[in-house]
């Protein structure tokens, strides 16, 4: 019943109007899985390769027909006839056929779309929801939790056309008792933030991830605006709602000078100075998580940052680790950061994603499941977060269907699982137990 009989790849459009790969995997019993690959803007240099056509006459060179041809041709040929329930085998076959270190022959966008579509088809064949199938693949059947959302309500950096250098200012509705309540709190703060920004004569257009993208005089001003919005919504900052930031520091690191340049503020810092700049913000505001607080290659700086702040708050590696077990293993050995951001298109298959989550958890690191800035209506990351009991999710703000699709799927899953999927709030965040 779970033998693969047909594989289809197609070019669809993502939330930024760029093409991406969608795949369908059809099984013997008439079961079908469909999934689409997301795409990042601030990408780590060691991510698996997203294959683009480079043909300037189509989609400004961003077409994905080569990746789609790989799905419809060589990938389909090798996995047709195989058992979709054996996810590790399906992924391994594709990885071996690609034969490159970073999936550059077929593209991680091709391999991932098929990998996820295969998992969805297998779940359908087993007559179970995707999160339940993922929990079985993860070796943790029936073990679920609802993730604490990190909601990106002010966008800067590569995600917005403004003067704010830090890429994401996020809220975590830690006072909520359920995921559904967390979404409500997030929505109320989001709408109150619009009022706060409007009252200051600021723009309330949204960035790629659905957060506002105003011009602000400093990063601290973004935090101050959020604090005002939280209070305006009737919540207590630090008790009901905590803060998180994604610096995406590689984007403002000057490799020539070795300095971190906050152009919006007209300031530049050495590596250790930037750590202390961030530490200063954490003393002023209840920031419990900082992602990519330094450049991905600044491992000495990260070791120092972890020493200074790692005992008190969650330090998440995104560009730093790129969901790659080899790099994560080295980071764990060297005591770099204490959490990993999980983006399955950074590594390019479900099996490798599950391996990264397991490695992190075994080492006492937390794992934060994440969207990309280029998304589709595909909500697989919601099932991934619940099925691995990862505990935290980053999937944007309270606007744009490409973001909200994930929250809505989490609401459905929570309704289905009830007490079997507890919402643990702040307890999920490293250093906040």
From Swiss-Prot:
Transmembrane segments: none annotated. InterPro entries: Enolase, Enolase-like_C_sf, Enolase-like_N, Enolase_C, Enolase_CS, Enolase_N. Mg(2+) binds at residues 246, 291, 318. Signal peptide: none annotated. It is an enzyme of class 4 (lyase). GO terms for molecular function: magnesium ion binding; phosphopyruvate hydratase activity. Its main location: cytoplasm. Binds a second Mg(2+) ion via substrate during catalysis. It is found in: Cytoplasm; Secreted; Cell surface. It comes from the Bacteria. GO terms for biological process: glycolytic process. The keyword Glycosyltransferase does not apply. Catalyzes the reversible conversion of 2-phosphoglycerate (2-PG) into phosphoenolpyruvate (PEP). It is essential for the degradation of carbohydrates via glycolysis. This is Enolase. It comes from Edwardsiella ictaluri (strain 93-146). The gene is eno.
């Amino acid at each position: 019943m779970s033998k693969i009989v047909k594989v289809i790849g197609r070019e669809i459009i993502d939330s930024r109007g760029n093409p991406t790969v969608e795949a369908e995997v059809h099984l013997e019993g008439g079961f079908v899985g469909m999934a689409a690959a997301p795409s990042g803007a601030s990408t780590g240099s060691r991510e698996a390769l997203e294959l683009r056509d480079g043909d300037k006459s189509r989609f400004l060179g961003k077409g994905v027909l080569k990746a789609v041809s790989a799905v419809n041709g060589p990938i389909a040929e090798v996995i047709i006839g195989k058992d979709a329930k054996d996810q590790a085998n399906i992924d391994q076959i594709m990885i071996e056929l690609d034969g490159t270190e970073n999936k550059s022959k077929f593209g991680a966008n091709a391999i991932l779309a098929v990998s996820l579509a295969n998992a969805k088809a297998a779940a359908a064949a087993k007559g179970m929801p995707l999160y339940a199938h993922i929990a079985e693949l993860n070796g943790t059947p029936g073990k679920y939790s609802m993730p604490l959302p990190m909601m990106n309500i002010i966008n800067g950096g590569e995600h917005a056309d403004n003067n704010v250098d830090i890429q994401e200012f996020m809220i975590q509705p830690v006072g909520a008792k359920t995921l559904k309540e967390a979404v409500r709190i997030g929505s109320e703060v989001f709408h109150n933030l619009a009022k706060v920004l409007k009252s200051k004569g600021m723009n309330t257009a949204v960035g790629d991830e659905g957060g506002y993208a105003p011009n602000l005089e400093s990063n601290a001003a973004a935090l101050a605006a959020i604090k005002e919005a939280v209070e305006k919504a009737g919540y207590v900052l630090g008790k009901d709602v905590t803060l998180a930031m994604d610096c995406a520091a590689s984007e403002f690191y000057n490799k020539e000078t070795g300095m971190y340049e906050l152009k919006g503020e007209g300031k530049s810092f050495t590596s250790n100075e930037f750590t202390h700049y961030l530490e200063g913000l954490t003393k002023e505001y209840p920031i419990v998580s900082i992602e990519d607080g330094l450049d991905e290659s600044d491992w000495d700086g990260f070791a120092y940052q972890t020493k200074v702040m790692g005992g008190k708050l969650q330090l998440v590696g995104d560009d730093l680790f790129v969901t790659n077990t080899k790099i994560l293993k080295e980071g764990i050995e060297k005591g770099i950061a204490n959490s990993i951001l999980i983006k399955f298109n950074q590594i390019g298959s479900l099996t490798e994603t599950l391996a990264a989550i397991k490695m992190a958890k075994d080492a006492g690191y937390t794992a934060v499941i994440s969207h990309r800035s280029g998304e589709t209506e595909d909500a697989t990351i919601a099932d991934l977060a619940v099925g691995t009991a990862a505990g935290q999710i980053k999937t944007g703000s309270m606007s744009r269907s490409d973001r909200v699709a994930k929250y809505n799927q989490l609401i459905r899953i929570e309704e289905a699982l009830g007490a079997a999927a507890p919402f643990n709030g702040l307890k999920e965040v490293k250093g906040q137990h």
